[in-house]
A protein has these predicted regions:
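Small-residue-biased structural context
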Residues: 1-158
């Protein structure tokens, strides 16, 4: 990943973990990772739930509560992208209960992996460059401090 504004580094680290999980989800659903079959799918679903609880949930909250509002306010061209990213967050949240399923779990895991990868790529390739381009206007250093503090606190409490 390209060098990022220091305030985005915690989010980019989460993205690295998310991309690795997304790849494992798709490969698991395609039977390319052992154990295959229902056992492998259950293991991967558990891994997704663990990462969601440990990182993704607080990551989404940090973006929705800190990053997205500031960007929407100061970078009007980001509004449509942010609306799409918010829908992605909601779609991930809606899929979480489906990871308990026994029927159709392969499709759920594949689709979640696909959604997560596309979402992360859009943030890294579209949203973060906009943030960096408008860093002075949106108060990037203040946002960076708020993001860092929020994520530290949220993950300490989990």
């Amino acid at each position: 990943m390209p060098k990022r504004h220091p305030g985005l580094i915690p989010l980019s680290h989460d993205h690295h973990h998310g991309l690795a999980l997304a790849l494992r989800c798709r490969k698991q659903a395609l039977g390319q990772i052992k154990p295959t079959g229902a056992e492998g799918l259950r293991l991967r679903a558990g891994e997704f739930l663990t990462l969601y609880a440990a990182e993704l949930s607080s990551h989404f909250e940090a973006e929705e509560g800190i990053l997205f509002p500031k960007m929407s306010l100061h970078v009007p061209e980001s509004e449509e992208l942010i609306a799409d990213l918010m829908r992605d967050h909601e779609n991930v949240r809606l899929a979480i209960p489906k990871l308990q399923a026994t029927v159709g779990l392969g499709k759920v895991i594949f689709d979640l992996g696909d959604l997560l990868e596309r979402h992360i790529r859009r943030e890294e390739r579209e949203l973060f460059p906009l943030f960096e381009q408008h860093a002075a206007v949106i108060g990037a250093d203040e946002i960076a401090e708020k993001l860092t503090n929020f994520l530290k606190l949220a993950r300490r409490l989990d």
